[in-house]
Regions:
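N-terminal Rossmann-fold NAD(P) dinucleotide-binding loop
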Residues: 113-114
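Short helix-loop-beta connector
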Residues: 96-103, 125, 187-188
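Rossmann-like adenosine-cofactor binding region
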Residues: 152-241
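Adenosine-phosphate binding glycine-rich loop
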Residues: 201-304
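NAD(P)-binding Rossmann-fold cofactor-contacting core
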Residues: 122-150
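N-terminal ligand-binding/catalytic initiation module
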Residues: 1-82, 90, 100, 249, ...
Length: 304
């Protein structure tokens, strides 16, 4: 993320092809010289897969040699996307959430919801988790699984409002076209992470954005036109509630100390993620290094 904010990374806005069913296939190339490399990710987003045996996000990552351009590896990008997205949110919580944050709200019931709960446990002393989603049965199932695997009190609730009530951390990971995070749901001092993407709507309402200290991965990425940007920030700008300068900082600027983070215990902070390819490059480099060390994978001769 420091590469992104310093300009060392080469990372054009993603492009996508859409299909009539509402799905899309996006291309996300990047070069990240520090702890990354040269790669591109191809990722499909098909919200209609929710509740089926297929994930909503499916991806491949292709790694290239940054000196010669030679293809080096083809990796499962679905797992990489899940883990790097949750890791980015956890990094934002490490930098912005109150140190005493103990109650976590999970909005959504998919793979990102579970990954976010697991990631937040690594950076804050979470003691209680509340889960809400469109499907009550799936919320109950996720809460039960989190309680078993994480060893904390995890309960399903009926509404997003109930999940957010008195929460110190709110993680939104949905495909909702209408806000699941509303300002009136939130208590002072909460840290919100939002990774949901919907071309027809948004996950966080304008009032929350206007009141919050807003941090992103890349200002250029969030303000880019679809499919690269996000309605969560574009719409409040169009409504005249905020200016583009309301975006306080990029994560990389917090890491280097170029910008400060939370300034008071009661401040609401918001990390709006659109997912940037530099994160995929860094994650792919870690996976490829580990695979080589452990002798994993299959070698394919493309010239044969």
């Amino acid at each position: 993320m420091e590469d992104v904010s310093s300009g060392r990374a080469s990372m054009p806005a993603r492009i996508a092809a859409t299909v009539p069913s509402g799905g899309l296939l996006a291309a996300m190339p990047a070069y990240a010289p520090t702890g990354g490399g040269l790669m591109t990710k191809l990722v499909s987003l098909f919200p209609g897969n929710s509740g089926t045996s297929l994930p909503t996000h499916q991806a491949l990552v292709i790694v290239f040699d940054a000196e010669s351009g030679e293809p080096l590896a083809l990796l499962d990008g679905t797992s990489i996307t899940t883990l790097r997205t949750a890791a980015g949110s956890a990094l934002s919580a490490e930098l912005l959430a109150r140190p005493d944050a103990r109650t976590l709200a999970i909005l959504g019931t998919g793979v990102q919801a579970r990954a976010h709960a697991e990631a937040m446990m690594r950076v804050r002393p979470i003691q209680q988790i509340r889960v809400a989603g469109r499907n009550r049965d799936r919320a109950v199932s996720l809460a039960s699984a989190l309680q078993d695997t994480l060893g904390v009190d995890a309960q399903a609730v009926d509404t997003y409002r109930q999940a957010c009530a008195d929460a110190d951390l709110v993680c939104a990971a949905t495909h909702s076209p209408v806000p699941v995070v509303e300002r009136e749901f939130l208590k002072p001092g909460v840290h919100v992470t939002s990774v949901g993407y919907n071309t027809d709507g948004r996950e966080v309402d304008s009032a929350t954005v206007a009141d919050a200290l807003v941090v992103v991965e890349s200002v250029a990425a969030v303000l880019a036109p679809p499919p690269a940007g996000c309605n969560d920030l574009r719409l409040p700008i169009e409504e005249g509630l905020i200016e583009p300068g309301h975006i306080h900082a990029e994560i990389g600027e917090l890491l280097t100390g170029a910008k400060a983070g939370r300034t008071s215990p009661d401040q609401i902070t918001l990390y709006k993620s659109v997912g940037v390819a530099a994160q995929d490059a860094a994650a792919a480099d870690l996976v490829l290094t580990a695979a080589r060390r452990q002798g994993l994978g299959v070698t394919i001769d493309l010239s044969a």
